[in-house]
A protein has these predicted regions:
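A short helix/loop element that forms part of the nucleotide-sugar donor recognition site in Leloir-type
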Residues: 139-154
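Carbohydrate-associated surface elements
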Residues: 113, 132
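N-terminal strand-loop element at the rim of the active site
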Residues: 1-41, 197-205
Length: 344
């Protein structure tokens, strides 16, 4: 995958020991068997060896719930303090997560939505532990600095609606586009800023064409892999020429391999006038908190972890949604109302 290799210098930066999943030859064998590949990816093949070698006082498991399959049966499980911190973002709660609750004393989830659901099932020891972010990195610039920042990106009196997200299917891109289209009819100066990668997940150009939205009204973030500068402008394809350093084919939409720094991301929030985050479900959705620290009004789907961030005291407005069921899992998912996005 895109993980850090064992011999990478990055493994030397933290105060921890790193272990590789397996030998290259063994990895090739695991790839052929989907379940074994997944288990190895979660560290299941080395956990016993690591416990024996390090003799830890505390085991902290921060993974999807299926990563801990039968860990409670291991001889070391009840001999040390064990804690899991897992993402539960939809109702009904995943059966594996419910079954594991009585098997671990310290059970943490990422949102009070999940804590509430688990307690309704009788598991009062489940608690919420939220993901952390550096609050010193996200703040609102004074109006003069915001004006200069916007002008540096060719923006003057436009009204910018922003959405920071990984381009995944659970992020409701069609919904925000439809809501923006309705809003644009009432506010001619509106622009939509999608800080995401345009070469994965939703085919955004196709959606814009289907919805008859002018591509020039939808902005995105480009990052140069050479000079690390960023540009805010309409999408015009990948591997563009950087306007700052002049490098050819080094400018791409922000992505997991090359993104912006926290300082740059804070600047991008400061380009916005309002932040909108529609999604089907989520564990925490940290960009919502970053936007709040930047003193933006946030519009958030009122489901899953969104329930925590669209309350009156949180500085956010709830977005209405309709239920649909995810095939296979039968999870309840949210389809955010485009009209409510427009009205809010």
């Amino acid at each position: 995958g895109k993980g850090i290799e064992l011999d990478s210098k990055a493994t030397k930066h933290g105060r921890w020991e790193c272990r590789e999943a397996s030998t290259p030859a063994h990895i090739k064998q695991l790839i052929k068997k989907k379940k074994k590949k997944r288990d190895a990816g979660y560290g299941a093949k080395l956990i016993d060896k690591a416990i024996q070698e390090f003799k830890p006082d505390v085991y902290i498991g921060m993974e999807d719930i299926w990563a801990f399959n039968n860990y409670n049966l291991k001889p070391w499980w009840h001999k040390i303090n064990t804690m899991i911190w897992t993402t539960l973002d939809s109702l009904p709660i995943l059966p594996q997560a419910v079954d594991f609750a009585p098997k671990v004393k310290h059970y943490y989830v990422w949102s009070s939505f999940a804590e509430k659901a688990m307690k309704e099932l009788g598991y009062d020891h489940v608690k919420t532990l939220r993901g952390s972010l550096d609050e010193n990195m996200f703040f609102r610039h004074n109006e003069e600095d915001r004006k200069k920042l916007r002008e540096s990106h060719g923006l003057t009196d436009e009204f910018i609606v922003g959405f920071v997200f990984r381009n995944q299917l659970r992020k409701s891109v069609p919904n925000i586009l439809e809501g923006f289209k309705l809003f644009k009819q009432k506010n001619s100066k509106a622009k939509l800023l999608l800080h995401t990668h345009w070469s994965e997940g939703w085919d955004i150009p196709r959606l814009l064409n289907e919805k008859n939205i002018d591509p020039s009204d939808v902005l995105t973030t480009y990052v140069c892999s050479n000079c690390l500068s960023y540009e805010i402008r309409p999408f015009s394809g990948q591997e563009q020429k950087c306007n700052k350093c002049g490098s050819e084919k080094t400018l791409n939409t922000t992505n997991t391999s090359r993104g912006v720094t926290d300082q740059q991301l804070n600047e991008i929030y400061n380009l916005m006038d309002v932040y909108c985050h529609p999604f089907t479900s989520g564990g925490q959705e940290i960009p919502i908190q970053e936007a709040k620290l930047s003193e933006l009004i946030t519009l958030v789907t009122n489901y899953s972890c969104g329930e925590d961030t669209c309350t009156e005291e949180s500085g956010g407005f709830p977005l209405e949604w309709s239920e649909y069921r995810e095939p296979g899992t039968q999870f309840i998912k949210a389809s955010t109302h485009a009209l409510d996005i427009c009205d809010k």
